[in-house]
């Protein structure tokens, strides 16, 4: 089905958008950090920027890039999906981007954090950094990327938190739609599915 590749990342952002809206906030003008640079991360970053956010940092297993003007999603997709290269290559090809080898993306100042890389990537110490830097929203794009200690910090510091069981269910919802389409021998457009 269309949107299968994008579904989990898009869904994470749509869930976060609803969470933000409940508190009179929105993505428009927000600074966002996204850990990871696989499908979930890339498409979460893409959708956040489509909604008016600036994705100021993204990571891979070697480090992270920081880009105050926002990530160039098309170049990032070319580097990660076509060339299968590293974020350090993205930094080399883009003006105004700094690469932090082995750095901790959670030290970057942002309004929204979307951990989309791997399990237990965001611990209590990282959660404190996010809180100290003014982060207000965290939504799990990956499966269980936040440790229990991190979640406790979010609770104590009044950071709105969306667990992956809810926030990253866009892929599951799209799979259900795909099964329905297959059963009825029907198809939906990209825009409808999005």
What name fits each language-model region?
Residues 17-22, 119, 128, 144:
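Conserved helix-loop functional segments at active or binding sites
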Residues 100-110, 120-137:
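Rossmann-fold NAD(P) dinucleotide-binding segment
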């Amino acid at each position: 089905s269309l949107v299968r590749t994008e579904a989990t990342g898009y869904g994470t952002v749509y869930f976060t958008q609803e969470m933000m809206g409940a508190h009179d906030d929105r993505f428009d003008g927000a600074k966002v950090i996204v850990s990871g640079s696989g499908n979930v991360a890339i498409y979460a970053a893409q959708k956040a920027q489509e909604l008016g956010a600036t994705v100021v940092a993204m990571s891979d297993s070697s480090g992270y890039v920081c880009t105050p003007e926002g990530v160039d999603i098309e170049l990032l997709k070319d580097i990660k999906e076509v060339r299968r290269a590293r974020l350090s290559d993205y930094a080399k090809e883009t003006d105004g981007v700094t690469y932090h080898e082995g750095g901790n993306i959670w030290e970057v100042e942002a309004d929204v954090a979307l951990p989309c890389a791997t399990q237990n990537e965001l611990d209590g110490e990282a959660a404190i950094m996010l809180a100290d830097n003014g982060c207000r929203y965290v939504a799990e794009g990956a499966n269980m990327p936040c440790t229990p200690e991190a979640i406790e910090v979010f609770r104590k510091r009044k950071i709105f938190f969306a667990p992956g069981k809810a926030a990253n269910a866009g892929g599951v919802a799209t799979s259900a739609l795909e099964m329905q389409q297959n059963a009825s021998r029907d198809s939906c457009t990209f825009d409808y599915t999005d």
